[in-house]
């Protein structure tokens, strides 16, 4: 997966510059957090940098892509913030001090291919949180009609690619024209809630939008907040 993200890294900033709705949400959680702040799948620092700016604190950022992390380091210096950036697998999360907040923006948990992978990630998150610490993430609210509609569609941005939908396992493959492929394994609400249960985390809130909108049948996003 890291090689696919490496291929996107040079143009990821241009694409993600329009993705801003989640930033105030995660900033708000960070301001409330007592203890270290940890971002999973930190990428180029799209969320971590404004979190560090708003809180005046260092954010630990984990990502498997060296190219993404290299961009995040440059951007952090340019913005004058401190990020502790670490190359690693979020399924093997380990930090030195229990965290007050661990968050995973950008629907990045959907890149974990199996329920077992997500379970491992959630268990490592639970082990890394301090008592009553928070874990927050967002993901597409799965809709097979939407997935079916994009099947076979080609797009030129942020890199030329084609989407393919695998009905059998709720997977959308994003195949770059040069052959690299990244995948999103969509999950239902109950699958996410089951992961919280097995990891020993408790649900605090589930929203359908970053302004705290309630989740309903028209929601296109899950926004979860859980506590240890």
Regions inferred by a protein language model and the residue ranges of each:
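Class I SAM-dependent methyltransferase SAM/SAH-binding core
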Residues: 48-92
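SAM-dependent methyltransferase
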Residues: 136-197
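C-terminal lobe and adjacent flexible extensions of AdoMet/dcAdoMet transferase-like proteins
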Residues: 189-228
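Conserved class I S-adenosyl-L-methionine
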Residues: 1-43
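A conserved beta-strand element that flanks and buttresses the S-adenosyl-L-methionine
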Residues: 103-105
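A short glycine-rich, Lys/Arg-flanked "PGG" loop and its adjoining helix->strand segment in the class I
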Residues: 119-131
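A short acidic, Gly/Pro-enriched loop at the edge of an enzyme's catalytic core
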Residues: 94-101
């Amino acid at each position: 997966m890291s090689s696919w993200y490496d291929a996107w890294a040079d143009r990821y900033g241009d694409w993600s510059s329009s993705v801003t709705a989640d930033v105030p949400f995660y900033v708000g959680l960070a301001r409330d957090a007592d203890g270290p702040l940890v971002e999973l799948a930190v990428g180029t620092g799209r969320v971590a940098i404004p979190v560090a700016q708003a809180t005046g604190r260092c954010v630990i950022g984990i990502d498997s892509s060296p190219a993404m992390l290299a961009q995040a380091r440059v951007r952090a210096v340019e913005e004058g913030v401190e990020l502790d950036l670490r190359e690693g697998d979020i399924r093997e999360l380990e930090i030195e001090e229990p965290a007050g907040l661990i968050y995973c923006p950008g629907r990045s948990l959907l890149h974990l291919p199996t329920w077992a992978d997500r379970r491992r990630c959630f268990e490592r998150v639970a082990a890394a949180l301090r008592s009553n610490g928070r874990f927050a993430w967002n993901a597409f609210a799965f809709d097979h009609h939407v997935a079916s509609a994009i099947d076979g569609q080609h797009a030129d941005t942020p890199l030329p690619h084609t989407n393919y939908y695998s009905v059998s396992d709720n997977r959308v493959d994003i195949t770059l024209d040069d052959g690299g492929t990244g995948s999103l394994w969509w999950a239902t609400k109950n699958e996410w809630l089951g992961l919280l249960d097995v990891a020993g985390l408790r649900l605090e809130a589930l929203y359908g939008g970053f302004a705290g909108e309630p989740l309903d049948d028209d929601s296109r996003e899950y926004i979860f907040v859980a506590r240890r």
